[in-house]
């Protein structure tokens, strides 16, 4: 991902897990109108932040492949993220079946759980750009 869709500021990968962060600046396009007078990061954007972190975790598999969302299971939204918050993401690969990778992820603000879910990605070959 690249701007304006890059939603990871910092990342630390250690084998089976990734820790990543994103600081909500307040001027992001997805905050406009969500909600007037009380901007809150939309749940789908929290999921995107976690998904991007998951892809950083499996980056070794992405040299020749692109990860496409296959699904999000058990997504739960517990606490809002607002401008000024730093969202911390932790993700772990739970299983791999052929070209499908399963990852469990959580996002937190100040140790309060914002969102959790089980993500699956299907790896497809990168197109040959010759």
What do the predicted segments below correspond to?
Residues 104-106:
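Beta-strand signatures of extracellular beta-sandwich domains
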Residues 11, 41-64:
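Active-site helix/loop of acyl-thioester processing domains in fatty-acid/polyketide metabolism
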Residues 15, 45, 49, 100-102:
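An amphipathic alpha-helix/helix-turn recognition signal
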Residues 1-36, 40, 65-66, 78-82, ...:
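Non-catalytic linker/capping segments at the edges of enzyme domains
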Residues 53-90, 114-122:
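Hydrophobic beta-strand-centered segment that forms part of the acyl-chain substrate-binding groove
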């Amino acid at each position: 991902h690249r701007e304006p869709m890059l939603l990871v500021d910092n990342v630390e990968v250690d084998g089976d897990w990734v820790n990543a962060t994103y600081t909500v600046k307040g001027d992001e396009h997805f905050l406009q109108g969500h909600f007037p007078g009380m901007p809150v990061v939309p749940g789908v954007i929290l999921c995107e932040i976690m998904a991007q972190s998951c892809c950083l975790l499996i980056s070794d598999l992405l040299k020749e492949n692109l990860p496409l969302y296959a699904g999000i299971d058990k997504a739960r939204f517990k606490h809002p993220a607002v401008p000024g918050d730093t969202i911390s993401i932790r993700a772990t690969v739970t299983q791999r079946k052929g070209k499908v990778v399963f990852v469990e992820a959580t996002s937190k603000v100040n140790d309060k759980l914002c969102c959790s879910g089980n993500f699956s990605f299907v790896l497809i070959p990168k197109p040959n750009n010759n």
